[in-house]
């Protein structure tokens, strides 16, 4: 009997219906963030957008996204002009939340990823639309004839959300080697291609930043886009190297009296409180932005060497993925939501063979489980858990059937790590979501967050190490 697969239209209908059902769901502070940005772009002239600070939710996205908010504000006028008043702080109610969700659902892709499901359709952001642009750019890079459009589309994406700068080194090296230099010799420059790419990127940047540059506001925009005054770790530790570093620091605080270690009293509450700009370590040395930048740059440069030597599309996607890994694992003040920078490009090559799938599997589990704390109200618990677990089961079963055998030897230990890691995730989810509250009530509230973050960090780091091996041995 032939297998039956749903059509794209059927998936779109189901996805759209599900997103409409989520209109009354939990409303995060991001609702007020985007309402305030609508109000700023509608109420003030262009020159004041990046200076206005009536609300703590100041505009800190690049100009193209600010222009998008202005367009959305013109629609919001028809719904309720009161929501466009800057002083109407915390204005969003259920009806306005529904109208914003409806507009946002129409603007994003129909991907059924639990990550986008949690971040965009409940927590409320616009990642789906921008990841759709990223995927289009990555796909366009596959053909020489559309390589220019890939670079220009990515440049436009950078002007919408600056987090994609993390992936820019891979784009720079690939476009340089595959488009600007001759395939026969790196010492021969294709000048016409350089002119077309440079002019296109210049036009995009000029459109985005030109009006602000005329007023001398570029430094102010950069201050908003790159606020290094914030701490190393976000309020909830992103599952990266610094989460593991923070966990070790917490353990050493307990062991310090026995080991004779000195403890900085002023830092004892810093990591557990997770306040912005408040990250300090009690036993281990503090980490500076320079250290984060240096580590990120080093671990991004390593895969770029192979990409420059062998500028194939598979190597390009691998380098984009590894640039995402490096920035997520070693970056300063990384948000847990940034894990999608790794998951989404990696998914394009996860089925290349079983070695790729073996590296992707723990990332898929860790990345999606790490997003659970974003939805902390009881009403969303069954939704996020059942949907994510169901998606992961389908993914593990379907991808396992579809991934072809590798022509190279697989790594026994890594395969066992992947299986064990996925198995442990089930009791961890149960404890952090239900068990802790039953046993401890409202005491030790930081423990489930710490366990989730640290466990997820092990999966992400393990996946990164595994994929580095796969990338350089393929």
Curated annotation (Swiss-Prot):
Pathway: Protein modification; protein glycosylation. It is found in: Endoplasmic reticulum membrane. It holds the Pfam family Alg6_Alg8. GO terms for biological process: dolichol-linked oligosaccharide biosynthetic process; protein N-linked glycosylation. It is a multi-pass membrane protein. Keywords: Endoplasmic reticulum, Glycosyltransferase, Membrane, Transferase, Transmembrane, Transmembrane helix. InterPro entries: Glyco_trans_ALG6/ALG8. The chain crosses the membrane at residues 4-24, 102-122, 156-176, 194-214, 235-255, 291-311, 329-349, 356-376, 379-399, 420-440, 450-470. It catalyses: an alpha-D-Glc-(1->3)-alpha-D-Man-(1->2)-alpha-D-Man-(1->2)-alpha-D-Man-(1->3)-[alpha-D-Man-(1->2)-alpha-D-Man-(1->3)-[alpha-D-Man-(1->2)-alpha-D-Man-(1->6)]-alpha-D-Man-(1->6)]-beta-D-Man-(1->4)-beta-D-GlcNAc-(1->4)-alpha-D-GlcNAc-diphospho-di-trans,poly-cis-dolichol + a di-trans,poly-cis-dolichyl beta-D-glucosyl phosphate = an alpha-D-Glc-(1->3)-alpha-D-Glc-(1->3)-alpha-D-Man-(1->2)-alpha-D-Man-(1->2)-alpha-D-Man-(1->3)-[alpha-D-Man-(1->2)-alpha-D-Man-(1->3)-[alpha-D-Man-(1->2)-alpha-D-Man-(1->6)]-alpha-D-Man-(1->6)]-beta-D-Man-(1->4)-beta-D-GlcNAc-(1->4)-alpha-D-GlcNAc-diphospho-di-trans,poly-cis-dolichol + a di-trans,poly-cis-dolichyl phosphate + H(+). Residues 1-3, 123-155, 215-234, 312-328, 377-378, 441-449 are lumenal. Its EC number is 2.4.1.265. It comes from the Eukaryota. GO terms for molecular function: dolichyl pyrophosphate Glc1Man9GlcNAc2 alpha-1,3-glucosyltransferase activity. Residues 25-101, 177-193, 256-290, 350-355, 400-419, 471-474 are cytoplasmic. Dolichyl pyrophosphate Glc1Man9GlcNAc2 alpha-1,3-glucosyltransferase that operates in the biosynthetic pathway of dolichol-linked oligosaccharides, the glycan precursors employed in protein asparagine (N)-glycosylation. The assembly of dolichol-linked oligosaccharides begins on the cytosolic side of the endoplasmic reticulum membrane and finishes in its lumen. The sequential addition of sugars to dolichol pyrophosphate produces dolichol-linked oligosaccharides containing fourteen sugars, including two GlcNAcs, nine mannoses and three glucoses. This is Dolichyl pyrophosphate Glc1Man9GlcNAc2 alpha-1,3-glucosyltransferase. It comes from Chaetomium globosum (strain ATCC 6205 / CBS 148.51 / DSM 1962 / NBRC 6347 / NRRL 1970). The gene is ALG8.
């Amino acid at each position: 009997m032939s297998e039956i697969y749903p059509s794209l239209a059927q998936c779109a209908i189901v996805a759209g219906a599900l997103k409409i059902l989520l209109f009354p769901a939990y409303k995060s502070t991001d609702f007020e963030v985007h309402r305030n940005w609508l109000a700023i772009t509608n109420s003030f002239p262009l020159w004041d957008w990046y200076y206005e600070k009536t609300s703590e939710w100041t505009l800190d996205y690049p100009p193209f996204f600010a222009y998008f908010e202005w367009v959305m504000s013109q629609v919001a006028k028809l719904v309720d002009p009161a929501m466009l008043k800057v002083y109407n702080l915390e204005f969003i109610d259920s009806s306005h939340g529904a109208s914003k969700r409806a507009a946002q659902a129409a603007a994003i892709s129909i991907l059924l990823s639990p990550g986008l499901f949690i971040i965009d359709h409940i927590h409320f952001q616009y990642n789906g639309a921008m990841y759709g642009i990223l995927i289009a750019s990555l796909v366009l890079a596959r053909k020489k004839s559309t390589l220019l459009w890939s670079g220009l589309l990515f440049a436009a994406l950078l002007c919408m959300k600056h987090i994609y700068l993390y992936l820019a080194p891979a784009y720079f090296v690939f476009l340089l080697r595959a488009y600007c230099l001759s395939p026969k010799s790196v010492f021969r420059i294709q000048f016409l291609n350089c002119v077309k790419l440079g002019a296109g990127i210049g036009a995009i940047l000029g459109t985005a930043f030109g009006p602000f540059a005329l007023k001398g506001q570029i430094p102010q925009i950069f201050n908003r886009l790159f606020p290094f005054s914030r701490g190393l770790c976000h309020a909830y530790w992103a599952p990266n190297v610094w989460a593991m570093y923070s966990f070790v620091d917490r353990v050493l605080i307990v062991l310090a009296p026995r080991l004779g270690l000195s403890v900085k009293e002023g830092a004892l509450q810093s990591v557990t409180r997770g306040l912005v700009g408040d990250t300090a370590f009690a036993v281990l040395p503090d980490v500076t932005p320079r250290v984060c930048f240096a580590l990120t740059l080093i671990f991004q440069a390593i895969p770029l060497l192979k990409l420059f030597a062998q500028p194939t599309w598979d190597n390009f996607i691998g380098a984009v993925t590894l640039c995402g890994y490096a920035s997520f694992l070693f970056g300063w003040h990384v948000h847990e939501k940034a894990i999608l920078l790794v998951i989404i490009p990696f998914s394009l090559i996860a089925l290349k063979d079983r070695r790729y799938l073996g590296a992707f599997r723990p990332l898929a589990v860790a990345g999606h489980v790490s997003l659970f704390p974003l939805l902390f109200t009881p009403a969303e618990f069954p939704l996020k858990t059942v949907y994510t677990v169901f998606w992961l089961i389908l993914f593990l079963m379907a991808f396992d059937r579809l991934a072809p055998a590798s022509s190279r030897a697989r790594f026994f230990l890594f395969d066992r790590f992947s299986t064990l890691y996925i198995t442990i995730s089930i009791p961890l989810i149960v404890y952090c979501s239900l068990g802790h509250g039953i046993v401890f009530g409202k005491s030790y509230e930081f423990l489930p967050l710490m366990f989730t973050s640290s466990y997820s960090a092990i999966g992400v780091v393990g996946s990164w190490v595994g994929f580095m091996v796969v990338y350089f041995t393929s």
